[in-house]
């Protein structure tokens, strides 16, 4: 028997064994939501106890209750199919200036407060290991992203540009919770800074958005420098249950929140 069973199989087994008993409605909801996910997402979820999965999920959702209510959730799904309007601007953006914790590549950077404070945590940890982070890109307005995307289309053509640049309204940068670190080039991942961020970012709530080998899932080429702040609990949940792929977890959370109880 194949030892690599998916959570969905475990749920079906659980439901069959408890058919004559009162079933946890969250188990039934989990079954429906997982059936709606892509085959690749379902295949990424390891075998496990559905009730353990739900306990971890509820911990992540409880964390969301602490998010500010006057702005988008830190789990907000934005990608090629989900967008924000051209007028959306995160509330209370904080300027990201060069200081004793990090360097910057330009002087017009900013982040949502939650991401800013998480960057402080991440940067202090990096400094303790002898590394000073370089912050190269943060919040981008709809208009800024529009100009950037159009420039790339003119430079490389639409087909190629769409593989590495977001159309306006679909960029994580517009949410004010994403950072591009370092040189914004593939070789940055092999630098001391790049390796440190890759290995430690999740400890401080930062998740790699566009991993290598998942362009068909995320819609974008590998970007070793692009990290999104989602919080520590979500990073743990992502690693434990979604093969550490941010897109899978955010799609699941979006589907869960939209599904009927």
Annotate each language-model stretch with its function:
Residues 20-138, 142-261:
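Extracytoplasmic cell-surface/polysaccharide-interacting catalytic and binding patches
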Residues 1-4:
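Positively charged n-region of N-terminal signal peptides that target proteins for export
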Residues 8-9, 233:
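Intrinsically disordered, low-complexity segments enriched in polar/charged small residues
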């Amino acid at each position: 028997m194949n030892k690599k069973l998916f959570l969905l199989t475990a749920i079906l087994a659980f439901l069959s064994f408890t058919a004559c008993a009162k079933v946890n409605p969250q188990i039934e909801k989990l079954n429906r939501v997982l059936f709606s996910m892509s085959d690749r997402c379902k295949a990424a979820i390891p075998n496990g106890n559905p009730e353990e999965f739900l306990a971890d999920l509820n911990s992540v959702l409880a964390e969301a209750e602490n998010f500010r209510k006057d702005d988008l959730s830190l789990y907000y799904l934005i990608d090629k199919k989900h967008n924000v309007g051209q007028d959306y601007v995160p509330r209370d953006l904080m300027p990201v200036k060069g200081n004793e914790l990090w360097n910057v590549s330009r002087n017009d950077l900013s982040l949502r407060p939650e991401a800013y404070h998480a960057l402080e945590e991440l940067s202090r940890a990096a400094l303790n290991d002898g590394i000073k982070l370089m912050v190269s890109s943060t919040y981008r307005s709809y208009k800024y992203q529009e100009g950037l995307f159009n420039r790339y289309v003119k430079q490389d053509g639409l087909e190629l540009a769409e593989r590495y640049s977001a159309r306006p309204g679909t960029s994580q940068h517009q949410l004010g919770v994403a950072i591009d670190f370092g040189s914004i080039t593939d070789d940055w991942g092999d630098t001391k800074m790049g390796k440190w961020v890759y290995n430690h970012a999740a400890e401080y709530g930062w998740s790699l958005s566009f991993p290598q080998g998942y362009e068909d899932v995320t819609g974008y080429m590998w970007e070793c420098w692009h990290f999104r702040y989602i919080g520590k609990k979500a990073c743990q949940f992502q690693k434990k249950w979604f093969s550490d792929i941010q897109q899978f977890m955010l799609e699941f959370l979006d589907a869960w929140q939209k599904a009927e109880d």
